[in-house]
Amino acid sequence: MNYPINRQDYAAMFGPTVGDKIRLADTELLIEVEKDFTTYGEEVKFGGGKVIRDGMGQSPIINGDDDNTAVDTVITNALILDWWGIVKADIGIKQGKIFKIGKAGNPYTQDNIDIIIGPGTEVIAGEGRIVTAGAIDTHIHFICPQQIETALAAGITTMIGGGTGPAAGTTATTCTPGPWHIHRMLQSADAFPINLGFFGKGNTSKPEALEQQIKAGALGLKLHEDWGSTPAAIDTCLTVADLYDIQVAIHTDTLNEGGFVENTIAAFKNRVIHTFHTEGAGGGHAPDILKVCQYDYVLPASTNPTRPYTINTVAEHKDMLMVCHHLDPNIPEDVQFADSRIRPETIAAEDILHDLGAISIMSSDSQAMGRIGEVILRTWQTAHKMKLQRGWLAPNIDPETHYDQSEQDSDRGNDNYRAKRYIAKYTINPAIAHGISQYVGSIEEGKLADLCLWKPAFFGVKPELVIKGGMIVWAQMGDPNASISTPEPVYMRPMFGAFGGAIGATSMTFVSQAAIELEIPKQLGLTSLVAPVTHTRDISKAHLKHNYTTPEMRIDPETYEVWADGELLTCEPVSVLPMAQRYFLF
């Protein structure tokens, strides 16, 4: 017998369903549920008098690896927001990996069940929650280990970068130089409940030192201007990368000492490269580093301190730059260096290039002119600002499927495509760029269950739960001495997944294939799940989800004005942002 229920009551009980819209935090962004995997009337929910009880929604089936056994964990009635869609579903987790996205329950009493709940199944309530893939930050200065706590509390589950601690080289550049430092950082990684990978230093005109670092366990190489990003170093680094299937990241030559942007592009020789600081102020060829956005072999990323362009951005950046790059405000040349790097015109253009999908990746530049805990937050602030200033975003026609959803989105008044474009910038696209998308970066079957649960009102600001390799690793938790878990003070605290042997069983360390073949993980006694990066050299910008546009770029060297496909890119700084004062005391 059917029982009618109105949408409001249904959403309160089981979360939104097809046709319902959800506001992301306090932004002007609205997403709409595109599909619901449930069978109406057969939804599963845990609690007193609810469905997941023996003989009802819970079966007597044991846990196991195959499709006909129960899952270890089920997230019920979750609203999934990912690059591939915005759907309502149950999520089944087995052995720390995403087993199935579909309908959970008891196959003995319910139809259309593909996620079996049994006595050995834990339940995480996803009703009224948005679930996203754990964020990936590929621009980490490993200056202090406390960054990892901040990252996890913000929803980041993978950190890629370089460094050895608060050394001068690390505070300025993202390199872990030499095999000894690489080995020590790999051993240190075992202590942290997060996925990690380290760049070797890529600045040399001879290949031997680069090969040594790759074989030691670097997952990639980093070229940084402070070490000399010359055309010779670029060419050598990319040549070695092609031999070993690892990615190269580059911070180009701000001062144009070793060559101009055209010389750097020529040194690329059409080989794929991940360009850091493809932006308005963070570094790289002044003033025209944004030119690289037009090339299909360039995977462009920007960092979060300029995101989005506000009335405070320029002033803040000058002070940050002087500290990060050891500049002296009493030396005129140092001041000129700072002024050339902080340009309002190119910062404004950076906003729009993100909205066009021409800048494909968002990252932090942690403690080196960027904030590790604000990658997600500032991505969505940028999306909000662009909706206010540029209006509804029409989707590009997908180059692989040729699917155009613009009519659907515009008629329904949702921001689904803009949401997919922006979430891809810190999830699947950095994973593709660094050869780890087969493990992480999206909510897809077979990938590591690195997931974040958000209350919609706190989306992008403060996650409710962070799941790492299928286990809760960080969560909003109240007073441990209270009679229940919710009394104040409630804040993000480490959970059981962040301790002991659970860390190694749920976290990955990414290295080169060469290091795997040389058995470096075994020699170092690593306890985490170690995996090689792959397919970093046979990709292009076209492989990056929803962020693959390559407009013809022109930057005026005197006025710093930016054009894309003949259109002047300019926008006003804002004085008020969402996801800001409303959520934080300081």
Swiss-Prot record:
PTM entry text: Carboxylation allows a single lysine to coordinate two nickel ions.
Cofactor: how and how many bound: Binds 2 nickel ions per subunit.
Keyword Secreted in record: no
GO cellular component terms given for this protein: cytoplasm
Reaction(s) this enzyme catalyzes, per UniProt: urea + 2 H2O + H(+) = hydrogencarbonate + 2 NH4(+)
Binding site for substrate: H224
Family: Belongs to the metallo-dependent hydrolases superfamily. Urease alpha subunit family.
Name of this chain's protein: Urease subunit alpha
Organism: Gloeothece citriformis (strain PCC 7424) (Cyanothece sp. (strain PCC 7424))
